[in-house]
Swiss-Prot record:
<feature type="region of interest" description="Disordered">
    <location>
        <begin position="946"/>
        <end position="1008"/>
    </location>
</feature>
<keyword id="KW-0347">Helicase</keyword>
<feature type="compositionally biased region" description="Basic and acidic residues">
    <location>
        <begin position="185"/>
        <end position="212"/>
    </location>
</feature>
<keyword id="KW-0378">Hydrolase</keyword>
<dbReference type="GO" id="GO:0005634">
    <property type="term" value="C:nucleus"/>
</dbReference>
<dbReference type="InterPro" id="IPR011545">
    <property type="entry name" value="DEAD/DEAH_box_helicase_dom"/>
</dbReference>
<feature type="domain" description="Helicase ATP-binding">
    <location>
        <begin position="592"/>
        <end position="770"/>
    </location>
</feature>
<dbReference type="Pfam" id="PF23469">
    <property type="entry name" value="KH_12"/>
</dbReference>
<keyword id="KW-0507">mRNA processing</keyword>
<protein>
    <recommendedName>
        <fullName>Pre-mRNA-processing ATP-dependent RNA helicase PRP5</fullName>
        <ecNumber>3.6.4.13</ecNumber>
    </recommendedName>
</protein>
<keyword id="KW-0547">Nucleotide-binding</keyword>
<feature type="binding site">
    <location>
        <begin position="605"/>
        <end position="612"/>
    </location>
    <ligand>
        <name>ATP</name>
    </ligand>
</feature>
<dbReference type="Pfam" id="PF00270">
    <property type="entry name" value="DEAD"/>
</dbReference>
<feature type="compositionally biased region" description="Basic and acidic residues">
    <location>
        <begin position="22"/>
        <end position="38"/>
    </location>
</feature>
<dbReference type="InterPro" id="IPR056149">
    <property type="entry name" value="PRP5/DDX46/KHDC4_KH"/>
</dbReference>
<feature type="compositionally biased region" description="Basic and acidic residues">
    <location>
        <begin position="967"/>
        <end position="980"/>
    </location>
</feature>
<keyword id="KW-0175">Coiled coil</keyword>
Length: 1191
C-alpha cells in the first residue's frame, strides 16, 4: 500500500532527523499549540500539505544568492552547538544529500512525490537554519525558559513584508508570510481583531479614569506594588520597573519598529498598545507639575512615546544582559546629546540604582516566548499602565527635590557599591537621608522609604557602605591635618627620628613566663656497658691518647670510641657509613656523649677536625624526638655562623641526613633574596642555618609573622669567638632573648681566646668545655713556612710557588690571602696576565658572585682563589694543598684559621706566610703559632718579635690580639675614631643604629654651619647707583676681622668653607664684595636696577652644581624674572687669585626690583645649603666595607 507523500514514518536507526533535537523545537511546539499550524518537515496528518510548493518558491527566491555558503556554515555550527545532537556529523551538503537519498531508496514513490519530498526536506533545513544565524555566538541551547532567550531580529530584517503599526504579523520563527491560508485561519483572525477593538475601548475608558488619580492614591498603589515586587522571584516581570525602564529607548531610530519579530499574539499586541496609551495618558500629569526644569522635558517626551519593546531592552541591560548592538549605542548617544552634563549626572543619581534590584532577567526579544508570561498579560496590564504614569510623576518630583537640596547643602559625591550617592555633612542628617531616598528611586516620602528599608535586606549594605564612606572625609579633615602641618613645621631632627624608627628592625619580644611551655626531652645518653667498666685513670689515659682532650665541667661523660656507642638512630648510622666515616674524630668522641646528654657544650678543636658533624648528629636525634611542626611553628634547630660561605657549607653537610630522616632545612644569609627564604620558612623547616643579621630580618619581617623562635630548643654558634665579637654580640643576644629558657646551647670554634669566655658564659648553663689539641693551635699536618721579604719580591715568590706546585700536582688548589679588597683585585689581574686562571672573593662582591666563585673553586674550574679573611673560616676544599698569606695576618687567631684551610681531615698541606720588615706587629702572633705547633721559628722573625716587644714596653707600640672582647662597644669607639668604614659593615649585617640626641645635634650643627657659610658668601641686594660708592668705601676702609672665622678642628668640610669665606670677608672688608676696587660687571644694556652676588668658588662641587645647573636656574628665572649669570674663574682650595685676574667663581643676580632679586637670592641660598649638606654626608659615607673602591 502506498504511503501518502507527507505522512510520517519512523526514521531509520542512526538517522540525523530522528536523533536530533533542534534549538527552536520548543518554539515550534508552542506555535503549533497556539495556531494549529506545524512548521516541521513532515506532519502526522494524513492529508497532504498544499503549502509546500509556495514555501519552496519563496525560499528559492529569498535565499538564491547565499544558498550554498549560508546553509553549509549555519548547519555545521548549529549541529555542533546543539546539546541534544546524537547522530553522525554532517560536514557538508553533498554528504548530507547523499545520505538523505539513500534513506528512501527502498520506498515506493512516484517521481513527482520524490521531488516534492526532497524539496520539502531541504526547505525544512532552511527553516531550521534561518533562526540560528544570530545565535551561533552564544554556543548554548536557546528557546527554553532556563536559558537566556535570544533575539530573532535578524529574521525580522530578512522578511520581505514589513510589520504594520499595530504589530499584526510576524511569527516566533523567521519565516516568509504565507500566501494562502485556510478558511479557519481567516475566521480566527477576524475573531481576534474583534476582541482587540473591544479591549482598546475598555483601556481608553480606564486611561481617562487614571488621569484623575491624585498623588496620594498613586503613592499607595506604588507602596503595594513595591511590597509585591520584594517578594517576587527574579524572573517575574515587575510592572513598576518596566514602566521606569521604558524611557531607556527612543523611537527616533527606525529599526526597532521595523524589526519586531514577535509571534502573532493578541495578548502581545494588547500589551504594546496598553503601554503606548498609558504613556499618552500620562502627559497631562507630567505637565501639571510646577517648577519643573526645562531640561527635564526632553527625556520625558521621549519616554511617553516609547513602546514595550525598548522597555524590555532596558530591563535586560540593567540586569547585566547588555546588548551591544548598533541601535542601543545610537539611542544612548542621542540621549546624551540631548542632555547637558549636569542633567546626565542627576539621571545617574536617581535612576540607575533601582535597576539591578528589581530588573527582569528575561531579555526583551524573547518575552513572548515565556509560556508563564503569556497567560498573565491581562492581569498585569492595568497595573502596568497605572505604574507607568506614577513612575514618571515620582521620578520628576524626586528630581525637583534633589535640585532644591543641592542649592541648600552643596553635597559631595561618593561612590557606594557601584551607585552614586550624595554625601552631606554630619551636621545635616535630614538632607543626607533625603539624598538616599533619591538614590533608591523607590518611594518619595521619607517614612515610606524607611519602612521599605526595614523590609528589604538588599538596600541595607548600600546604606552601611554610605555611612562608612561619609566618615572618611571627616577623618581626613579632622585635627590630624593640623598635626601633620605641625610636623612639617618642626625641626629636621623629628623627621630623622621618624625615618630611623621605620628603618629600625624590632623583634617581637616573648615573655615565656606567661606562656605554658611543653617540656622537652634533651637527655638521650645511655652509657654503654664497655664504657661504664672504665676507671677514671683509664679514661684519663684515653683522653690523652686522643690528641690530648681536655675537659672542664661537672659530670662529664666518658668519650666513645666507635659510632655504635653514640646512641644514634639506625638511619643516622646508615648515612654515616655511606659517607665513609670509619670512626669518630677526637672532638666527636668527647662532644657526642656530652651533647646527647642534653648539656651545654663549648667545643674547641683544630681546623678540619670534624666539629660540624659533632653538633649535627645530636641535633637530628633531638628533633626527631619532638612532635612534628604545625603550620605556624618555627624551627627546632638553629645554627648561626659569622660568614655566609660557612652557612652554605653547613647546610650542604646537612643534606645527606635530611633526606633519610624526612627533615627540612633552610639556609638564610644576607645578600640573597629574602623572598625565597621567607617562602621556604612558611612551608616549614625543622632546621635553619643562618647569619645573625638575616635572622633578625626574618624575625622582624611582617611584624614577626614569618617565623618565630618559640620551638627552638637546640642552638649552635659555629665559630663562636667571632659571634661574640666583630659586632655580632648585640645581634646574637637579641636573638637569644627570644628563645626558650630551657634550650640547649652549643658553641664550637677552632680558636677561643680567654677574653671571650666571660661573654660566652652569659648564654650557657652549667657547660662542659671540651678542648682538643689546645686553643688556637695549627694542626700538625700543616707545614708552615714563614718568609721575611720586601713587598716587590712577593709576587715573584708567588709565581715560583705556583710553578713548583702545579709541576707536581695539576689538580691541586691554591688559596691566597690578602689584607684588602683592592689588593685582591690587583693580584688577580697580575696573575691573569701571567697565564694563571684565578678568581677573587671578598666582602665587596655580590653574594651571587661569591657563591659561584666558591663553587667553581671547589669543583676545580679555577685552581687559584684570591680572598680576604672572609674565606678564612669554615671553607673546606678537598684538594687544597697550598695556602699563601700574601699579606701577613695581624693576630694569632686569624693566622690559625687561614693556615687551617689546608691539611684537613688528616691530609697534609703547606702554609706560606710573607712578612715584610715593617710588619713587626704581626711577628709575635705568627711566632707563637709556630711554637705551639712545634715548627721552627726563622731568625729574622724572632728578631722582629723581640723588637716589637721592646716597643710595647717603651710605649711606642701596642700589643693587640685581634679581639676587642666588648662587641659593639669596642667597635663603636673604633668607628668614631676613624669616622669611616666599620659603620657600614655593621649596618650591612642587619643592625641599624638608633638615632641619638648627639646625632641630631650634629645634623643641626652641620646645617647651621652651611647656612652661616652661605650667608657670608652672599651679598646684600644693592642698587646700581650705589655700586661705585661701595667700591670707594671698600678702598678707604681698613681690613676688619670678623667673628666669622672658625677654627679648623676636625677638618670638617663645612668648617673649611666657613673659614675660607670668613677669610675672604676679612680680606675684602665687606661681606660678599668680590675684591676691593672691582666694580660689579652689570653695566650692560640688560642690566637691572638692583643686583646681588653669591660667591660659590669655595663650596663643594655638588653644591656648586646645585646652583648652576640649567634646570634649577631656569625655575628661578621663570619664578622671579631676574637675570642669573655665573662669572669669574674657579680656583682650587689654597690657590690665591693672581693680580689682575678674574675673581673667584660667583653668581650675579640682576633684576628690576629689590623684591625679585631678594627672592632669587633666597632660592639660590637654599639650593646651595642643601647641596653643601649633601656633599658633607656623601664624604662621610664609606663604601660597603671601607676597603673596596670600584675603578
Amino acid at each position: 500500500m502506498a504511503r501518502p507523500r507527507d505522512s510520517r514514518s519512523p526514521s531509520p536507526a542512526g538517522s540525523t532527523h530522528s536523533s536530533r533535537r533542534f534549538r527552536n523545537d520548543d518554539r515550534r511546539d508552542r506555535d503549533r499549540r497556539n495556531d494549529g499550524r506545524d512548521h516541521r518537515r513532515r506532519t502526522r496528518s494524513r492529508s497532504p500539505d498544499p503549502r509546500n510548493r509556495d514555501r519552496d518558491r519563496d525560499r528559492d527566491r529569498d535565499r538564491a544568492r547565499d544558498r550554498d555558503n549560508y546553509r553549509r556554515r549555519d548547519r555545521s555550527l548549529d549541529r555542533r552547538d546543539d546539546n541534544h545532537y546524537r547522530g553522525g556529523r554532517r560536514d557538508n551538503r553533498e554528504r548530507d544529500r547523499r545520505r538523505s537519498r539513500d534513506r528512501f531508496d527502498d520506498r515506493i514513490r512516484s517521481p513527482m512525490t520524490d521531488r516534492r519530498r526532497n524539496r520539502s526536506r531541504e526547505n525544512d533545513r532552511d527553516v531550521r537554519r534561518r533562526d540560528d544565524s544570530r545565535s551561533r555566538i552564544s554556543g548554548r541551547r536557546e528557546g527554553t525558559t532556563d536559558s537566556p532567550a535570544r533575539s530573532n531580529r535578524d529574521d525580522g530584517r530578512n522578511q520581505k513584508t514589513p510589520l504594520d503599526d499595530s504589530g499584526n504579523g510576524g511569527a516566533s520563527q523567521a519565516q516568509t508570510p504565507k500566501a494562502e491560508g485556510g478558511q479557519a485561519d481567516v475566521d480566527k483572525k477576524a475573531e481576534r481583531l474583534a476582541k482587540l477593538e473591544a479591549w482598546k475601548k475598555k483601556k481608553e475608558s480606564a486611561s481617562q479614569k487614571q488621569k484623575e488619580v491624585n498623588p496620594s492614591q498613586t503613592r499607595n498603589l506604588l507602596a503595594e506594588m513595591d511590597k509585591k515586587a520584594s517578594g517576587a522571584s527574579s524572573k517575574t516581570v515587575s510592572p513598576s520597573v518596566s514602566a521606569i525602564a521604558s524611557p531607556a529607548a527612543t523611537p527616533t531610530v527606525e529599526s526597532p519598529a521595523a524589526s519586531y519579530s514577535g509571534k502573532f499574539d493578541p495578548k502581545a499586541i494588547a500589551k504594546k498598545s496598553a503601554a503606548s496609551r498609558a504613556h499618552d495618558a500620562s502627559k497631562p500629569a507630567l505637565g501639571s507639575l510646577e517648577g519643573q526644569p526645562e531640561k527635564i522635558s526632553v527625556p520625558v517626551k521621549q519616554a511617553t512615546t516609547a513602546s514595550a519593546l525598548p522597555a524590555n531592552r532596558t530591563k535586560a541591560s540593567g540586569f547585566g544582559f547588555v546588548k551591544t548592538n548598533a541601535e542601543t549605542e545610537k539611542l544612548t548617544a542621542k540621549r546624551k546629546l540631548d542632555l547637558d552634563e549636569e542633567d546626565t549626572t542627576k539621571r545617574k543619581l536617581t535612576k540607575l540604582p533601582a535597576l539591578p534590584i528589581e530588573a527582569d532577567d528575561t531579555p526583551y526579544a524573547d518575552q513572548d516566548d515565556d509560556e508563564s508570561d503569556g497567560d498573565n498579560f491581562a492581569e498585569n496590564e492595568e497595573e502596568a499602565a497605572a505604574a507607568a504614569r506614577a513612575a514618571h510623576e515620582r521620578r520628576l518630583q524626586a528630581e525637583n527635590q534633589m535640585d532644591t537640596a543641592e542649592e541648600e547643602t552643596k553635597p559631595t559625591d561618593v561612590e557606594t557599591n557601584g551607585d552614586v550617592a550624595m554625601n552631606n555633612n554630619a551636621s545635616q542628617p535630614e538632607p543626607a537621608t533625603q539624598m538616599e531616598v533619591d538614590e533608591e528611586d523607590d518611594v518619595d516620602p521619607l517614612d515610606a522609604f524607611m519602612a521599605d528599608l526595614k523590609q528589604t535586606d538588599v538596600r541595607q549594605p548600600t546604606k552601611t557602605s554610605t555611612t562608612q564612606k561619609i566618615q572618611e572625609p571627616e577623618a581626613y579633615f579632622s585635627d590630624d591635618e593640623y598635626d601633620f602641618n605641625k610636623k612639617d613645621e618642626g625641626d629636621a631632627s623629628a623627621l630623622l627620628a621618624i625615618t630611623a624608627k621605620r628603618k629600625k628592625k624590632d623583634i617581637p619580644t616573648i615573655d615565656y613566663s606567661k606562656i605554658e611551655i611543653e617540656p622537652i626531652r634533651k637527655n638521650f645518653w645511655h652509657e654503654p656497658a664497655e664504657l661504664s667498666l672504665l676507671t677514671e685513670a683509664e679514661v684519663a689515659d684515653l683522653r690523652l691518647e686522643l690528641d690530648g682532650i681536655k675537659v672542664n665541667g661537672k659530670d662529664v661523660p666518658k668519650p666513645v670510641q666507635k659510632w655504635a656507642q653514640c646512641g644514634l638512630t639506625r638511619q643516622t648510622l646508615d648515612v654515616v657509613d655511606n659517607l665513609g666515616y670509619e670512626k669518630p674524630t677526637p672532638i666527636q668522641m668527647q662532644a657526642l656523649p656530652a651533647l646527647m646528654s642534653g648539656r651545654d657544650v663549648i667545643g674547641v678543636a683544630k681546623t678540619g677536625s670534624g666539629k660540624t658533624v659533632a653538633f649535627l648528629l645530636p641535633m637530628f636525634r633531638h628533633i626527631k624526638d619532638q612532635p612534628p611542626l604545625k603550620d605556624t611553628d618555627g624551627p627546632i634547630g638553629l645554627i648561626m655562623t659569622p660568614t655566609r660561605e660557612l652557612a652554605v657549607q653547613i647546610h650542604k653537610d646537612c643534606k645527606p641526613f635530611l633526606k633519610m630522616m624526612g627533615l627540612r632545612a633552610v639556609c638564610a644569609y644576607g645578600g640573597a633574596p629574602i623572598r625565597e627564604q621567607i617562602a621556604e620558612l612558611k612551608r616549614g623547616a625543622e632546621i635553619i642555618v643562618c647569619t645573625p643579621g638575616r635572622m633578625i630580618d626574618l624575625l622582624a619581617a611582617n611584624q614577626g609573622r614569618v617565623t618565630n623562635l618559640k620551638r627552638v630548643t637546640y642552638v649552635v654558634l659555629d665559630e663562636a669567638d667571632r659571634m661574640f665579637d666583630m659586632g655580632f654580640e648585640p645581634q646574637v643576644m637579641k636573638i637569644f632573648a627570644n628563645m626558650r629558657p630551657d634550650r640547649q646551647t652549643i658553641l664550637f670554634s677552632a680558636t677561643m681566646p680567654r677574653i671571650i669566655d666571660s661573654l660566652t658564659k652569659k648564654v650557657l648553663k652549667n657547660p662542659i668545655e671540651v678542648t682538643v689539641g689546645g686553643r688556637s693551635v695549627v694542626a700538625k699536618e700543616i707545614e708552615q713556612i714563614v718568609e721575611v721579604r720586601d713587598e716587590p719580591s712577593k709576587f715573584h715568590r708567588v709565581l715560583e710557588l705556583l710553578g713548583e706546585l702545579y709541576d707536581r700536582d695539576e689538580d691541586a688548589r691554591t688559596l691566597i690571602f690578602v689584607e684588602r679588597q683592592e689588593k685582591a683585585d690587583d693580584l688577580l689581574k697580575e696573575l691573569m696576565m701571567k697565564g694563571y686562571p684565578c678568581m677573587s672573593i671578598h666582602g665587596g662582591k655580590d653574594q651571587i658572585d661569591r657563591d659561584s666563585t666558591i663553587s667553581d673553586f671547589k669543583k676545580g674550574v679555577v685552581p687559584i682563589l684570591i680572598a680576604t679573611s672572609v674565606a678564612a673560616r669554615g671553607l673546606d676544599v678537598k684538594q687544597l694543598k697550598l695556602v699563601i698569606n700574601y699579606d701577613a695576618p695581624n693576630h694569632l687567631e686569624d693566622y690559625v684559621h687561614r693556615a687551617g684551610r689546608t691539611g684537613r681531615a688528616g691530609n697534609t698541606g703547606v702554609a706560606v706566610t710573607f712578612v715584610t720588615p715593617e710588619q713587626e706587629n704581626c711577628a709575635p702572633g705568627i711566632a707563637k703559632a709556630l711554637e705551639q705547633s712545634g715548627q721552627p721559628i726563622p731568625d729574622r722573625l724572632n728578631e722582629m718579635r723581640k723588637a716589637h716587644r721592646e716597643k710595647v714596653k717603651s710605649g711606642k707600640a701596642k700589643d693587640t690580639s685581634g679581639f676587642g672582647g666588648k662587641g659593639l662597644d669596642r667597635l663603636d669607639q673604633e668607628r668614631e675614631a676613624a669616622r669611616l668604614r666599620e659603620r657600614k659593615v655593621h649596618k650591612a649585617e642587619g643592625e641599624e643604629e638608633e638615632v641619638t640626641e648627639d646625632k641630631k645635634e650634629d645634623e643641626d650643627e652641620k646645617a647651621e654651619k652651611a647656612l652661616d657659610a652661605i650667608r657670608a658668601a652672599a651679598s646684600g641686594v644693592l642698587a646700581r647707583e650705589s655700586a661705585k660708592a661701595d667700591d670707594a668705601d671698600a678702598k678707604s676702609m681698613p681690613p676688619v676681622k670678623t667673628s666669622g672665622v672658625v677654627k679648623d678642628k676636625a677638618k670638617d668640610p663645612l668648617d673649611k668653607v666657613s673659614s675660607a669665606v670668613s677669610a675672604i670677608n676679612s680680606r675684602l672688608g665687606k661681606a660678599g664684595q668680590l675684591r676691593a676696587g672691582q666694580p660689579i660687571d652689570n653695566k650692560g644694556p640688560d642690566a637691572g636696577a638692583f643686583h646681588a652676588t653669591l660667591e660659590i668658588n669655595d663650596f663643594p662641587q655638588k653644591a656648586r652644581w646645585a646652583v648652576t645647573n640649567r634646570t634649577n636656574v631656569a625655575k628661578i628665572l621663570e619664578a622671579t624674572g631676574t637675570s642669573i649669570t655665573t662669572k669669574g674663574n674657579f680656583y682650587p682650595a689654597g690657590k690665591e687669585v693672581p693680580a689682575g685676574a678674574e675673581p673667584k667663581l660667583y653668581i650675579l643676580i640682576e633684576g628690576d626690583t629689590e623684591v625679585v632679586v631678594s627672592s632669587a637670592l633666597t632660592e639660590l641660598t637654599r639650593l646651595l645649603r642643601e647641596g653643601t649638606i649633601a656633599a658633607v654626608d656623601a664624604d662621610s659615607r664609606a663604601p660597603a666595607s671601607g676597603r673596596y673602591t670600584i675603578t
